[in-house]
Amino acid sequence: MSKKRLHEIAKEIGKSSKEVVEHAKYLGLDVKSHASSVEEADAKKIISSFSKASKPDVTASQTVKPKEVAQPSVTVVKETGSEHVEKTQVSKPKSRNFKAEREARAKEQAARKQANGSSHRSQERRGGYRQPNNHQTNEQGDKRITHRSQGDTNDKRIDRKASNVSPRHDNHQLVGDRNRSFAKENHKNGRFTNQKKQGRQEPQSKSPKIDFKARAAALKAEQNAEYSRQSETRFRAQQEAKRLAELARQEAKEAALKAQAEEMSHREAALKSIEEAETKLKSSNISAKSTADNRRKKQARPEKNRELTHHSQEGQKKNKKSWNSQNQVRNQKNSNWNKNKKTKKGKNVKNTNTAPKPVTERKFHELPKEFEYTEGMTVAEIAKRIKREPAEIVKKLFMMGVMATQNQSLDGDTIELLMVDYGIEAKAKVEVDDADIERFFEDENYLNPENIVERAPVVTIMGHVDHGKTTLLDTLRNSRVATGEAGGITQHIGAYQIEEAGKKITFLDTPGHAAFTSMRARGASVTDITILIVAADDGVMPQTIEAINHSKAAGVPIIVAINKIDKPGANPERVIAELAEYGIISTAWGGECEFVEISAKFNKNIDELLETVLLVAEVEELKADPTVRAIGTVIEARLDKGKGAIATLLVQQGTLHVQDPIVVGNTFGRVRAMVNDLGRRVKSAEPSTPVSITGLNETPMAGDHFAVYADEKAARAAGEERSKRALLKQRQNTQRVSLDNLFDTLKAGEIKTVNVIIKADVQGSVEALAASLVKIEVEGVRVNVVHSAVGAINESDVTLAEASNAVIIGFNVRPTPQARQQADTDDVEIRLHSIIYKVIEEVEEAMKGKLDPVYQEKVLGEAIIRETFKVSKVGTIGGFMVINGKVTRDSSVRVIRDSVVIFDGKLASLKHYKDDVKEVGNAQEGGLMIENFNDLKVDDTIEAYIMEEIVRK
């Protein structure tokens, strides 16, 4: 037999090759493309099937027509069918059940094998064209119907469809005429092909097909409309309740005012009416709330009867829940019919039939009346403070011409403009600098007036060198400490407290030498009363005038003590006249200053002086609050070898306790221990009490203020901040070379400099010595202080001196053995002194180049005190052992304790056992006594030395 290609068949019948290929596949032919060949019989079958599909179905309809029950029913069915045809042509199905298609395809292949190719899958035709494979209608179950070869079986199925009793076809009935004619023709030809006609199978029911998606959308829209109606009703009910409540409240107020104006007896009736109004308000609120809740509950409950019945169903299918239908979409994930089924575990199936969630009403927040802002606030921070969305603020800023994001910082002007736009009064927040402890001394608003009590006066003793300041203080304390001062002058501030007539007085002893100007100014700044001591035989001296100026600058009252009236040349009247020239006028002359003539050496009129001090203090009304955190001033500071930094503090306000976190100057720490002026440990210090504390991380400067903080964290932060600011200020003071000072800079390079390193026992001495050396004026030569610090001379000082070619000046300190050995090796000169004007004179003469032959100190040896013996009417004898060199009878000795010189003097006696000897050699033991010194202690170092005259070349 000859074969034909599919594209030739398509050309012959006037169809596209694609349609012919698909049609051949549906007829069960094994073809792949338009180039595939088929037998002549199969080609005729394809052509005949196309010609049959194009014939009108009027005859078939007329043939089936007598079997219909009633003519009106057929007319309705035909109309309904035509509607479905038009709808199916427009709309496309949303999903395919691939599993069902695979099963149906497998059944088709099995049926073809049994029927030997005589049974083929029916094809839905519309207008002569085959529907696409994935174009499934809602009647997907009727798509694949396989007929058996027996004619009676096919007739039974057709009859069952026509009688509308099949359980598999609940929603449809066949348009019997056309289907039966095709079924008979297929039975005669031996092929059981159930082809769908151009008019398509019409549903059995009289109503159109149910569009579940449209129904779900309509249901959701209906629910939303119902909810909005209920929200509006609820809102109107609430507004009405508020209006009624407001009217009731106004009526109650008017009734109350009227009753009060008419007669006081009607007050009870007014109160009763107010109570009734409040009850009415509560009942209206409750009723409105209950109505809203009930309506909300009704709206949220779904209507169960919506899916129970089909509005056009008849017979047994009516009132049947969830009936099975082959026209129903098999993939029912988005179907309302699936709402009562349990969701499989692990499947996130969204239920589309749930009632819509109510929209949460946004709360309205009122804007604040005032807004306190800080520089650099972000948009998000401002939005949070005024309870607005950041996007709203960004929009307002954009309208103002400012482009900003919610994390961008704004300046003060922009924030104020923004607040003006909102109608809010903007105020800049005043930030308190926690690192500024000076504010406590300027502003006393933090004090509690109820806790203020009287405090002890702080008295500073001022005067010229050797006018008797320390002797007076020694007499007041009943001790002989004045003899211990080198050269008869005080080298640093001493703070002491005495008690007179049941009241305490705090004394500050300041040095009188010109080098200690800053220390005298410091003493005047913390004092309440100044005692100006003037020698009756010397009169007014330069340091006396300076003390007067310091006291006047501090604004403190002055009490003049004319000392040494026991001397033969004493002339108190001359002193009074000289002081009057500087504004210090006695009360006897009509002035304001008290004058007291005393003799500190013989304890004359000392009681009168103390009474005068207490009288002036009472007039000044000195007060303090002991309940606040302590503040005060550093009197002196030094570095101890074993204890570290030690600071002498004067408490001015509050009470200082042990373990208090404290900031002192540019350093910080915690009060580890407190010692009073008598050397006893104390746990607290009240106002006007001097104490020495330990526990600071660095040595502060004398004159620095201190303040106690709430916790150690705050103290550490404040101390570090103050240290950072001080370093920044020091860097800013560095001089830069410019065209104006270029000549001066070049000229300064030609000047010779003398580099010095200063080490002293206390901070005040370091400051005084450095300031004095810098002030020395010698043409062509100047002093450069390379380094100054508190403590003994150590190896690092020697290394620095070698690098900078400097001279080390030790004031009341000694070098360590390692430092001395390194200085000898590196040829570094160390000058040790105990009197400040000796240092100044030596440096000045060296600068002028007029140094005469000088005496050089030569150390003979060192000894350690092993034991002390106190002998009455003789003094203290020290048993010693020589550890280096020798100790001679005519040598001078220094008593060194913790690398600090305690005393410098001559030997009174030197013995080896009971014999007087001229010297005691190395590793030998002996005993010694020192002139005018009895405070020897075990482990003190005795350094023996002599002064050798050398000629300077």
From Swiss-Prot:
Bias (Polar residues) ranges: 191-207, 282-291
- Region annotation G5: residue ranges? 599-601
Q: Which UniProt keywords apply?
A: Cytoplasm, GTP-binding, Initiation factor, Nucleotide-binding, Protein biosynthesis
Domain tr-type G, residue spans: 454-623
Main location class: cytoplasm
Function comment? One of the essential components for the initiation of protein synthesis. Protects formylmethionyl-tRNA from spontaneous hydrolysis and promotes its binding to the 30S ribosomal subunits. Also involved in the hydrolysis of GTP during the formation of the 70S ribosomal complex.
Instruction: State the PROSITE patterns in the record.
Output: G_TR_2, IF2
Positions of the UniProt region annotated as Disordered: 52-241, 279-363
Residues where GTP binds: 463-470, 509-513, 563-566
Q: Does the keyword rRNA processing apply?
A: no
Which residue intervals make up region (G4)?
563-566
**Where do Low complexity bias regions lie?**
322-338
What is this protein identified as?
Answer: Translation initiation factor IF-2
Annotated gene: infB
Q: Where is this region: G3?
A: 509-512
| Annotated segments matching region G2 | 488-492
Against HAMAP family, the record matches this protein to: IF_2_B
In residue numbers, the region (G1) covers 463-470
GO MF annotation terms: GTP binding; GTPase activity; translation initiation factor activity
Skewed-composition ranges (Basic and acidic residues)? 80-89, 98-111, 140-188, 229-241, 300-317
From start to end residue, where is composition biased (Basic residues)?
A: 339-348
Question: What is one cellular component GO term in this UniProt entry?
Answer: cytosol
What is the similarity comment for this entry?
Belongs to the TRAFAC class translation factor GTPase superfamily. Classic translation factor GTPase family. IF-2 subfamily.
Which PANTHER family does the record associate with it?
A: TR-TYPE G DOMAIN-CONTAINING PROTEIN, TRANSLATION INITIATION FACTOR IF-2-RELATED
Q: Which domain of life is it from?
A: Bacteria
